[in-house]
């Protein structure tokens, strides 16, 4: 008689907006990780939705959780709680719950009470984001931002004390957490660099023409227009640079958001600055990344950033805000700035002396296969070894 196949242990990835991803962030991380781990685990991924239910996407079980969108982080905390309760009811034999953002630490308490193995990813120093955003918020909303920042600080503490393991996505964040909270089990696991589909030169020129751009005649930033991502710094700096080149900023624009209103006001009548809104078509994103004069990454908080890793594949000059987690990735192969005036000087240098940089060797430890193997070991160490498949990813 043939032996029955050993069922794969069930794991849940909780806290992203869901799969398939658009670009960057937790969604890309969850998608790339789940499609590699599904050979060894029965993977559940929670998805923000307008309904409840479970379906499949590329062999991964999507758990749809009704969620209300909001500019603060209070609702995601509730979303994680609902997702945890739903999974405990619908996937009763799930072995491990992995919360991909620090606010999941509150929900990890529930999973621990239900005797599940738990992991929480602290992401960046998330509570600092709210303090930066608060400066641009309406006065009557600032107490809410302050309260949310405090909730995230508590979440950071819980993320280091409640789960069976805590994940830091950069060595600088790991050092910070170890010094401040002394987690019982602290692991380093970064993100991977997504490879976009190749686009032939004729198609690239066509895409650029539609966007009103020319090859190597624009600076580029791809990211959410939120205060901690520092886009106001680059607009302020670029306006002081005498150049016919353009500044292209790609990211979803909420025209009611006070920070977006600030960016539009700061841009003024400068026609060189183009706020293109969200662009998710891979061929267009590839074309923009491949043909920029330089890429500006003004993010001030966070850990390893997937959008930055993605840009490094193109070997265009990168100008980054000077923080340890950017230096950790880019090393000496980048321009660094702390103020708008420093950025002005860097852009003037690039204008007169453009150069390319080879970042590929930096990316060896940032491939998704490498990252998935790291996570396999972490998950495997927490789940009953007799129930895990020992084969290699």
Explain the meaning of each model-derived region.
Residues 2, 6-9, 16-22, 36-71, ...:
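N-terminal strand-loop element at the rim of the active site
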Residues 12-14, 208-229, 235-242, 248:
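Conserved donor-binding/catalytic core segment of Leloir-type glycosyltransferases
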Residues 54, 203-206, 246-272, 276, ...:
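Short, structured helix-loop element that forms part of the nucleotide-activated donor/catalytic region
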Residues 75-89, 94-128, 303:
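An aromatic- and histidine-rich active-site surface loop
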Residues 145-166:
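Membrane-proximal helix-turn-helix segments that form the acceptor-binding/catalytic region
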Residues 173-194:
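Helix-loop-beta element that forms the nucleotide-linked donor phosphate-binding surface
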Residues 300:
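Aromatic "clamp/platform" in nucleotide-sugar-dependent glycosyltransferases that forms part
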Residues 313, 317-320:
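Short hydrophobic beta-strand element within catalytic cores of glycosyltransferases
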């Amino acid at each position: 008689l043939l032996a029955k196949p050993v069922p794969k242990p069930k794991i849940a990835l909780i806290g992203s907006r869901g799969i398939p991803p658009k670009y960057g962030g937790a969604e890309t991380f969850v998608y790339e990780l789940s499609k590699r781990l599904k050979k060894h685990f029965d993977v559940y991924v929670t998805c923000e939705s307008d309904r409840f239910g479970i379906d499949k996407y590329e062999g991964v079980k999507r758990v749809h959780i009704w969620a209300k969108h909001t500019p603060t982080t209070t609702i995601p905390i509730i979303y994680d709680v609902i997702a945890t309760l739903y999974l405990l009811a619908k996937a009763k034999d799930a072995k491990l719950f992995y919360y991909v953002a620090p606010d999941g630490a509150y929900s990890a308490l529930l999973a621990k009470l239900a005797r599940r193995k738990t992991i929480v990813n602290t992401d960046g120093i998330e509570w600092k984001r709210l303090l930066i955003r608060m400066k641009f918020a309406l006065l009557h909303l600032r107490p809410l931002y302050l309260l949310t920042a405090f909730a995230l600080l508590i979440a950071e503490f819980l993320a280091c004390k409640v789960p069976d393991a805590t994940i830091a996505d950069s060595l600088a964040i790991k050092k910070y957490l170890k010094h401040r909270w002394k987690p019982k089990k602290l692991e380093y696991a970064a993100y991977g660099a997504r490879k976009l589909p190749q686009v032939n030169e004729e198609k690239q020129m066509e895409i650029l023409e539609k966007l009103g751009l020319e090859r190597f005649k624009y600076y580029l930033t791809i990211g959410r227009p939120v205060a901690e991502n520092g886009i106001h710094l680059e607009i302020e700096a670029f306006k002081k640079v005498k150049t016919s080149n353009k500044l292209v900023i790609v990211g979803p624009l909420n025209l009611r958001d006070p920070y977006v209103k600030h960016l539009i006001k700061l841009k003024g009548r400068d026609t060189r600055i183009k706020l293109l809104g969200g662009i998710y078509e891979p061929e267009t994103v590839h074309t923009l990344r491949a043909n920029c004069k330089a890429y500006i990454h003004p993010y001030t908080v966070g850990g390893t950033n997937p959008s930055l890793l993605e840009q490094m594949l193109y070997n265009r000059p990168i100008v980054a805000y000077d923080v340890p987690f950017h230096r950790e990735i880019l090393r000496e192969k980048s321009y660094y700035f702390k103020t708008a005036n420093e950025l002005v000087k860097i852009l003037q240098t690039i204008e007169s002396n453009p150069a390319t940089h080879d970042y590929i060797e930096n990316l060896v430890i940032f491939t998704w296969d490498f990252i998935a193997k790291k996570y396999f070991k972490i998950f495997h160490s927490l789940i009953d070894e007799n129930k895990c498949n020992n084969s290699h990813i």
